[in-house]
Amino acid sequence: VVDHYASLVEGFTGRATRRNRLKYSLDATTAYLNGLRDDLHTFLGTLPAVHIVGVSGEAAEDARVERIPRLAFGVTGVPSETVLRRLLANGIVATQTCATPLLDDMGVADMGGAVTIAMSPFNTQNDIEQLVRTVASLA
């Protein structure tokens, strides 16, 4: 498994120990996944009926925390079960976000629930664009 992760990204030019290749590969993979997540956040943020769950607005500008490559969102007026079914029908893997008191306080239940999307090294920019098109068809 370690060798697989060490070989995910080509182009390493340093001392080719497995440890160095693994660090290079994981750093590059992290940057790639964060880019996909940021693009998804940006594109979904342009859809008026979509509410992205989490830190946003002025609070996000000062947030200097690293985030994992996943995002939860809801579509106002569309139950999360409907969003999930549409995503799955279009070949997009997602999960329904479980209700919690915190999410209830954030208004997630009021908008019909939320779904969560997680990025993997095998996702592409095309996957992000397909996801956004699918969500836009609901909004």
Where are these regions (language model features)?
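Pyridoxal 5′-phosphate
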Residues: 1-139
